[in-house]
């Protein structure tokens, strides 16, 4: 219900029609939303900026350029955006900016539809807030209640969680709400699909009346708009279509490998091709990244590797080496498939096909950034053919068998 900052200019802001007409409203970005092209010009605290760059972000995505400043101003915000647009970092950066670290009480509450997403949000907050000494807890079902209570008693600046468990903790008075300044509803449409409507309303009733509300949703069905009417004061609207990553100019190939073990030999055969410019090799798990890195090194190939479990400092120096061109081949997980620009990368290898098709464009859409041409090679086992065809269909693209002269194409 944050309406204090900048609620002037009724004419500037097209008034929303009556609620029942909302379905016909072409949801568009409010007129007063300006674009802030860099993280440096957002007025963020120094220790947060360090965390943002250390995490590997260089330039804010479309939603980050528009929403962060509005949220920091204290405005209620409705952002319509799909996953893959940088939405999580948008509210995470905003939340971290608004915290008073000296006060060991919960100041921001983030609700998410799944345990996995809540944990992902918590990890992202801890990574971005690495230099701020931020305390952040994931409050999710299926875990030990006693552990939750202990963590909350210790004092957490931010709590991310699923509505059921969060409400349970509020009811038990383990999660104190008096210092909460901001409520974030991530993937709000998904939460409603999962039947969390009652719990969200229950949680909301316990929050201080002036709590700022940020709602993120890929779709805006009637129930969501009903919720925004109840929870929000004069919200700013931001519509972000999915990142305009393109597969144009990127030649995509697959290599059929009968067995998992043969992927390694295929990679070794390709190594000389990899080092023509710079290459990123994607695996689906951290363990696989570590295993492949070790195996490549044992075979006397020079590679560097990175994933979310490595200490921040280590990741920073690996990224620095890779950016400078000192290391040519980087093995990584999807943590790095977003928000990273290394212009020299013109070859991507999917050692494992991504777990979901949206990640595909994040992995390889990057290799053609700045209008550069790129090549993507997918290692495909027999049972992956289905996934590959699905990716082709989803992106209306064509993935051919890799030719012998692939080096000439890079």
Curated annotation (Swiss-Prot):
Principal localisation: nucleus
Spans annotated as Disordered: 1-20
InterPro entries assigned to the protein according to its UniProt record, in alphabetical order: DEAD/DEAH_box_helicase_dom, Helicase_ATP-bd, Helicase_C-like, P-loop_NTPase, RNA-helicase_DEAD-box_CS, RNA_helicase_DEAD_Q_motif
Top EC class for this record: hydrolase
GO cellular component labels: catalytic step 2 spliceosome; cytoplasm; exon-exon junction complex; nuclear speck; nucleus; U2-type catalytic step 1 spliceosome
Keywords recorded for this protein, A-Z: ATP-binding, Cytoplasm, Helicase, Hydrolase, mRNA processing, mRNA splicing, mRNA transport, Nonsense-mediated mRNA decay, Nucleotide-binding, Nucleus, RNA-binding, Spliceosome, Translation regulation, Transport
Residue intervals of the Helicase C-terminal domain: 249-410
Subcellular localization(s) per the UniProt record: Nucleus; Nucleus speckle; Cytoplasm
Amino-acid positions noted as binding ATP in the UniProt annotation, renumbered to this chain: 59, 64, 81-89, 341, 366-370
Entry's Gene Ontology BP terms: embryonic cranial skeleton morphogenesis; mRNA splicing, via spliceosome; mRNA transport; negative regulation of translation; nuclear-transcribed mRNA catabolic process, nonsense-mediated decay; positive regulation of translation; regulation of alternative mRNA splicing, via spliceosome; regulation of nuclear-transcribed mRNA catabolic process, nonsense-mediated decay
Chain positions of motif Q motif: 37-65
Pfam families tied to this protein: DEAD, Helicase_C
One Gene Ontology term of the molecular function aspect: RNA helicase activity
Annotated PANTHER family: ATP-DEPENDENT RNA HELICASE DBP3
Full protein name: Eukaryotic initiation factor 4A-III
Organism of provenance: Taeniopygia guttata
Gene: EIF4A3
